[in-house]
Amino acid sequence: MKELKIGFLQQHNTADTKDNLLRLGEGIRDLAKRGAQLIVLQELHNSLYFCQTENVNNFDLAEPIPGPSTSFFGELAQKFGVVIVASLFEKRAPGLYHNTAVVLEKDGQIAGIYRKMHIPDDPAYYEKFYFTPGDLGFHPIETSVGKLGVLVCWDQWYPEAARLMALQGAEMLIYPTAIGYESSDTPEEQQRQRMAWQTVQRGHAVANGLPVITVNRVGYEPDPSGLTNGIQFWGTSFVAGPQGELIYEASTDEEESIIVEMDLDHSEQVRRWWPFLRDRRIDKYTDILKRYID
């Protein structure tokens, strides 16, 4: 049995980035002392979700990798002997920015990065204004706790991303996330969206025989422009097993610091029962490369 203790922080952020980092640091210390070996943080955890508006001043939030945040989280990873999945606004070059997940190894070094591939552009989620689509492809990151299939938020709606990670030996799928309710939606529509979001990811777990770890932010963040009523981030961070079973589900409206124990060897048993990778008809899937089959 290959046991892994996975910790995550579901946090409400404010405009005070120093306070956000302070609380993240305290949360990481607490999780590490409770035995976490892998700690996953939410998407763009250093700041408010600034993509509600298109504002060039928000580019000042970006930083290089390596940079201040990788140093901060790397020191914590080394001090406590944990692997950390962080999510940063990367300044790659003047005028070139990415939404980037960074994995810090137990020795504090960068094990690898993943640049978000699918970039949304919806009301209150104006990410195309800020982020260039990733160019590193879908490749698991090798760490001392396993091969991590790290993706980011909007990627979670695309089965292709999860499949490509699985086909390259990922032992789990990890999604740092920032998603919430659109202010004008009815309660019924809000519930449908939240359930669809979780269901599609649990489907990735089933289809690939892999656990899924998704960490979302929580709480209300106002729209700085005043054009909308802001976003109520719905939390619901969760861990699902390789059959899609819910192992843990967080609150929709509270911060949480949780450790979940996972048996990574269970994926092998599930894939023996459900050999989906064996039965794929790879000779018949060429049309998947087309935008649409007319």
Question: What spans do the regions from the language model cover?
Answer:
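CN hydrolase (nitrilase-like) catalytic-core segments centered on the catalytic cysteine
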Residues: 62-85, 147, 153-256
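Cysteine/selenocysteine-centered motifs that mediate thiol-based redox chemistry or coordinate metal-sulfur cofactors
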Residues: 138-168, 177, 267-294
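Active-site-proximal beta-strand elements of phosphoester/diester hydrolases
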Residues: 3-15, 20, 100, 113, ...
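Short beta-strand scaffold segments in enzyme catalytic cores
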Residues: 86-88, 100-103, 139, 237-239, ...
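Short, glycine-anchored, charge-dense loop/turn motifs used at functional sites
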Residues: 103-111, 240-247
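A short, polar/charged loop-to-alpha-helix boundary motif
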Residues: 116-130, 254-271
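Residue-level detector of high-confidence beta-strand sites
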Residues: 100, 113-116, 249-251, 259
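Cys-nucleophile CN-hydrolase/nitrilase-fold catalytic domain and related Cys-dependent amidase chemistry
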Residues: 17, 26-106, 113, 179-210
